[in-house]
Amino acid sequence: EQSSVYRQLVARLGEDRVLLAAKPSDAPADQWARASTVVFVCGSTSERSYDSEFDDNGAAKAVTEYGATCGEGVDLSDIRLPWSQDDMLGEVAALTTAPIVSVAVCGRAHVLTDVLERSAVTIWAGYAGQYGPQAVADVLVDGADMSGRLPVTLPAYPAAIPVRYNDRQSAAHVYKDAAEPILRGFGYGAGSLAAVTFSEMHADTQSHPGEVLVQVTAHADDHGAAGAVNLFAHVSGGRRIPRLAMLVDSVYMDLNAGERRDIAFHVPCDRLRDVGDGQVQVTCTLDGDSTHTVTATLPGEY
């Protein structure tokens, strides 16, 4: 049987406490007024029908109405949420004073500016597979941790693209009417690691030939935590304009309550410079957070 966020919520709360509405007019005004929480599931789809026609390149053609909005052969000139979902959310917000929790089920980066502005909480579910609805309900009802990180860069405006975390030039202040075109950056979201503190970060280029060893101490609070910590690097020097940031390593950790643990990142030098670059300076940050930064110098005999 197919699962959905609605079915998972019904299984936990009971059918009498969960009302399903495909559009705002499906529920009477008094029901919207009585709601304690509104869960707005939005996003896109890559679903193809079994009788799809295929293009010359072998990709299934998307149907015009409610067909695939992402996937192979589905390039879009407008990456706002399809099917007027922003307008629908505006109608919902006008009908209720209850907090809105938006769940974005997306297979590509969409402009979620209106969604974030109108929602008390926004959960990026991506394409989470058959257990995705269960995971969302675990968060909404059971208070499960959200340990994931945003796997894409979300643009703030439909025309201020492309935006990529590892570009060589910043997208900020390129457009006069969109000073900050990035809504949420790649890797955004501390999730279940929000209460973890880091200290004693340092880099070692000597003990492991051919790689940079970055070490940091993690300290969990009274509840413990589990999730991935990402290490980003920015390289100065060399023959090319450097990328603003590169994801160079990721370490999953599972900390007990009150536990302190040393975490080690191993970054091959080949990922940080090209042949003939000479001496370069590498600045590493945890999850792009400038408060946790360390700098190392790679010698020039490469």
Task: State where each predicted segment sits.
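C-terminal non-catalytic regions of proteins with extracellular/luminal or membrane-system context
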Residues: 1-302
